[in-house]
Amino acid sequence: MKFELDTTDGRARRGRLVFERGVVETPAFMPVGTYGTVKGMTPEEVEATGAQIILGNTFHLWLRPGQEIMKLHGDLHDFMQWKGPILTDSGGFQVFSLGDIRKITEQGVHFRNPINGDPIFLDPEKSMEIQYDLGSDIVMIFDECTPYPADWDYAKRSMEMSLRWAKRSRDRFDSLGNKNALFGIIQGSVYEDLRDISVKGLVEIGFDGYAVGGLAVGEPKEDMHRILEHVCPQIPADKPRYLMGVGKPEDLVEGVRRGIDMFDCVMPTRNARNGHLFVTDGVVKIRNAKHKSDTAPLDAECDCYTCRNYSRAYLHHLDRCNEILGARLNTIHNLRYYQRLMAGLRKAIEEGKLESFVTDFYQRQGRTVPPLNVD
């Protein structure tokens, strides 16, 4: 992987990730394909929304279908027939999400398989091996996603262990002869001094890119913005920056303003299945009765398959009847909305007009622009 940085506007960056499998224009949003599928979508449909890279889930694909089935096909690209690059998370966040059924030690994480209850152990080395078999174009280190709220002492211990796991991840990744990219993950909760230690330690180990982890886990938006403003300038400028698990459209805008290059989130697909649709002027809850006889498209400014062909009334009808097509059409639209937003951000950075784009984005939704505390 090669990262090319074209231009900046304030702290925002316009560039691209170059892989053997294709080019990803940044800032980029990555749809999430947890089980080897972006829910309800064929790879061709995902590509048609403008997505150039997707995310797969190491933890879930390890449990089902498992490494051996994956290797029978070649790798995850061959298994799911996605031709572009794939980033896989390490499984750390999913283990964090297991809560009481897991035990974290220095060696790794002991937990019970949520499918059948069998005891399982996952550590940095195993995570690197699974992601190697998946053929991931971007591999994420294995870390502990520090919960929120966490006091300073807990956050410090967690961050320090994640640093040790980062070194173990790096060593196993290298010993496998993996030629793809490996990203470090910055932890430290909402504490700037801990984030400083984490960034410094990861940069000393050396990675192809750096993710900001442990955000969007319940902390106030002001804390997320503050941490991004503090951390991003410390990440080497020639490496991509990835904000994990984020987020709402406004979170993408605010991340870009603070120097983030990559995002992923289940929100556009999950919300689509619940009839919660993103449009230029805000949000449409398609199951509400007011859409029953609305012959207008979902978003007059959207060029997606759904908006070019169907009315709000039809989408409302499909939702009320619990038709699978409704979830699919909603997903196509939400994914396209996110890709159109990213394309707009990229163009604004190129033209040096990011802040006017941001102002228009919020004004269209009747909201005020959050403060930006950067030099």
UniProtKB/Swiss-Prot annotation:
Q: What is its EC number?
A: 2.4.2.29
Where does this protein hold substrate? 89-93, 143, 187, 214
Catalytic activity, per the record?
7-aminomethyl-7-carbaguanine + guanosine(34) in tRNA = 7-aminomethyl-7-carbaguanosine(34) in tRNA + guanine
Positions of Zn(2+) binding: 302, 304, 307, 333
Record region (RNA binding) = 245-251, 269-273
Top-level class of the enzyme under EC nomenclature: transferase
The cross-references to PANTHER family, in alphabetical order and at most eight, read: QUEUINE TRNA-RIBOSYLTRANSFERASE
This protein is called Queuine tRNA-ribosyltransferase
Q: Which organism is it from?
A: Klebsiella pneumoniae subsp. pneumoniae (strain ATCC 700721 / MGH 78578)
This protein's encoding gene: tgt
